[in-house]
Amino acid sequence: MLDVVDLSRLQFALTALYHFIFVPLTLGLSFILVIMETIYVATGKEVYKDMTKFWGKLFGINFALGVTTGIIMEFQFGTNWSYYSHYVGDIFGAPLAIEALLAFFLESTFVGLFFFGWDRLSKGKHLLATYCVAFGSNLSAMWILVANGWMQAPTGSEFNFETVRMEMTNFLDLWLNPVAQSKFLHTLSAGYVTGAFFVLAISSYFLLKGRDFEFAKRSFSVAATFGFIASISVLILGDESGYDIGKAQPVKLAAMEAEFETHPAPAPFLPVAIPNTAEMKNDFAIEIPYLGGVIATRSIDKEIIGLKDLQALNETRVRSGIRAYELFTQLRAEKKANGQVNEETKAQFNEVKKDLGFGLLLKRYTNNVVDATEEQIKQAARDTIPNVGPNFWAFRAMIAAGGLIALLTFGAFVQNLRNKVTQIPLLLKVLLWGLPLPWIAIECGWFLAEYGRQPWATYEILPVGVSASNLSTGDLWFSIGLICALYLAFIIVEMYLMFKYARLGPSALKTGKYYFEQSAK
């Protein structure tokens, strides 16, 4: 039966994955609009203005729903994860506050000028507004991913036993965290691919129907070029992000590669496996010798530490965490009784406080952490190993979808260069029906990032099990049902409007120049 923590996780997963349906398209379309309008201002060709306005209409529908779902998601830090907000809010809240005050206000202000300023602003000023929308969207993503990067690999912070909170010690370390920056660039390029693939798919639909040829062909050309470059960036930056995560979170690396044993370097790569987390082995696996180690460590002499060895290391850290928790409670008692603490006790605590989070893992099994049994200690260590199967297959689904996207954007780019886009209808059909591919890759990537971090809300600092609010299961089932109903309405509205305007094409602009307007005369 699902408890409060499980239901809180389920609700956050639903809202986060749903919200991220809209985010990558916003990121990608915003820069495609910049490219199209820049060409319009540079050449004066009206077709590029029409392209900017039409794709901007679809961007606007997506943007509105992305903002709405994002607000709902952020509220959960206060409603469902109140102890998390208390424990790490000083750090986690800072980039989110900057995002709201700087990036979100920038993009939301200029998005109004983008839509309503065509007849009120000069070409140059309107182009500047479009650039600000794109810049604001990307800046917003950066600060959100700085916050998420800290959850994955905490830097620039330390625990204060007096306030029982994590406190920021260096903002630059938080901001320039390598994990955060590589995640940001990888997510950004994935968004660019999503926007490009979206334009390619709908342009392919127009070309297959033989409608608005010039408009569709030019849209296809912009998207094919932008998408091909972005798809290469995704592969390169994805490798970099994976490398950084492998150094910061060896458990996640071992889980997504289903490495239960520590193999001599370089480790094999498993394209297919049936992981058995309970017995810490693969029931079936196909191995490609050496490839896994070369890809994951970029060397032939570095090991990928297996999950069995990582569990043993984590058991040692759980024991150290018990000592950290004991010293923490002692310091608190001394402070309360005497108004000051023993410096020797404080020095001892500082030596082991990095393992305090491992001690908190025991809260799932006992309120008296210091007197935890051997079985409870071993169970807490087992909890540090996430369920391998979902991580293993999510990673491979992401790679497979990303590889297909790269091949398709390459094909579109080559055909566009040859000026033979319409000569291979099969390519256009595959681009059209392959539209879900970017979302499959992105959602699998985010699932891997978050599920692979379990059992931690903030890696090796705060377990998920102690982060949740004091709610009832009834409260959570009600809110989950309400959110599902609301989000169902949102997706119906989104799909209706997207299909409506995508089918109309540039005729939706009512300029009198395009297919449905001409055929109605």
From Swiss-Prot:
GO terms for biological process: aerobic electron transport chain. Heme 2 binds at residues 186, 398. InterPro entries: Cyt-d_ubiquinol_oxidase_su_1 (IPR002585). May bind up to 3 heme groups per complex. Its EC number is 1.10.3.-. Its cofactor is heme. Heme 1 binds at residue 19. Pfam families: Cyt_bd_oxida_I. GO terms for molecular function: electron transfer activity; heme binding; metal ion binding; oxidoreductase activity, acting on diphenols and related substances as donors, oxygen as acceptor. It is a multi-pass membrane protein. The chain crosses the membrane at residues 23-42, 95-114, 130-149, 188-207, 220-239, 398-417, 476-495. GO terms for cellular component: cytochrome complex; plasma membrane. Probable cytochrome oxidase subunit. Belongs to the cytochrome ubiquinol oxidase subunit 1 family. Probable ortholog of the ancestor of E.coli AppC/CydA. Heterodimer of subunits I and II. This is Probable cytochrome oxidase subunit 1.
